[in-house]
C-alpha cells in the first residue's frame, strides 16, 4: 500500500517538535505526525539523564510562550531546574494539549528523500515503514547524537565508561569506585560534584 500523504511530518518530540506539532495541528489545522526514536517525549531532556543534569538558563526561558494559561499554571521549583523537572514539564505540555495522539514513539527515521515528481518527502523508518508529507521538519536538535571523541586506547580500556549523552536511564552506582572524567563543559561541571559525592 502507498504511504498516506500527510501535510507535515516532524522528526523529534522535544521542545521544538512539540511546539511545531501544536502550531501546525491546532493553529494551522494541518494533518501532522511526529516520529520520535525514544519511548517518551522530551528530546534532549529525555536522553540526557546524567548525574546533576540541569539547565544552565533560568527556568522562565524554558517555558513555551504560545499559551498564557500554560505559562501561568506551571511553577518551576528552582531557578535552574534539574532534568527530571524539565522532562515533567514537557510531558505536561504533551498531555495538556493532547499532543501524544499525533506522536509515534519508538520510531527512528532512517531516510528522508524529497521527490520532485510528487512534490513531497518520502520518509522511511528503521523498521521499513514509510510516510509521505508535503513538509518535513527535522526537530532533532543539536544534541541528539552523542559526540564520542576518538581517544586512543578507549577500545582497550578494561573498565566501564559512559558518555553523558548516552547515560543509562537506570543510573550508575559509583559508590567506592575510582572515576576519571574527560571534559569540563557545562555537562562536566554539572556531573562532576554529583559523581564525586559517591565515588572513592
What are the residue ranges of the model-derived segments?
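A short beta-to-alpha transition loop/helix N-cap that caps and shapes the active-site region
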Residues: 41-46, 145
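Glycine-rich dinucleotide-binding loop and its adjacent helix/turn
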Residues: 69-76, 82-86, 140-198
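N-terminal Rossmann-like FAD-binding beta1-loop-alpha1 element of flavoenzymes
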Residues: 3-34, 188-196
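Feature captures the FAD/FMN-dependent oxidoreductase FAD-binding
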Residues: 76-143
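Active-site acidic short loop of glycosyltransferases
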Residues: 6, 132-133, 159, 176
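Glycine-rich active-site loop/strand segments that organize a redox cofactor
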Residues: 46-89, 200
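Extreme N-terminal leader/targeting segments of oxidoreductases
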Residues: 1-8, 26-31, 55, 88, ...
Amino acid at each position: 500500500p502507498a504511504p498516506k500523504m500527510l501535510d507535515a511530518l516532524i522528526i523529534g518530540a522535544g521542545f521544538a517538535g512539540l511546539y511545531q506539532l501544536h502550531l501546525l495541528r491546532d493553529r494551522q489545522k494541518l494533518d501532522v505526525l511526529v516520529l520520535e526514536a525514544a519511548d517518551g517525549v522530551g528530546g534532549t531532556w529525555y536522553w540526557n539523564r546524567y548525574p546533576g543534569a540541569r539547565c544552565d538558563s533560568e527556568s522562565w526561558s524554558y517555558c513555551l510562550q504560545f499559551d498564557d494559561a500554560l505559562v501561568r499554571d506551571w511553577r518551576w521549583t528552582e531557578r535552574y531546574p534539574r532534568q527530571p523537572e524539565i522532562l515533567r514539564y514537557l510531558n505536561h505540555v504533551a498531555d495538556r494539549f493532547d499532543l501524544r495522539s499525533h506522536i509515534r514513539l519508538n520510531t527512528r527515521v532512517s531516510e528522508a528523500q524529497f521527490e520532485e515528481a510528487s512534490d513531497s518527502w518520502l520518509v522511511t523508518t528503521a523498521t521499513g515503514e514509510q510516510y509521505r508529507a508535503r513538509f518535513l521538519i527535522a526537530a532533532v536538535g543539536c544534541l541528539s547524537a552523542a559526540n564520542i571523541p576518538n581517544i586512543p586506547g578507549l577500545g582497550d580500556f578494561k573498565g566501564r565508561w559512559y558518555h553523558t549523552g548516552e547515560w543509562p536511564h537506570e543510573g550508575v552506582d559509583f559508590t567506592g569506585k575510582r572515576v576519571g572524567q574527560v571534559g569540563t563543559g557545562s555537562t562536566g561541571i554539572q556531573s562532576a560534584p554529583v559523581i564525586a559525592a559517591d565515588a572513592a
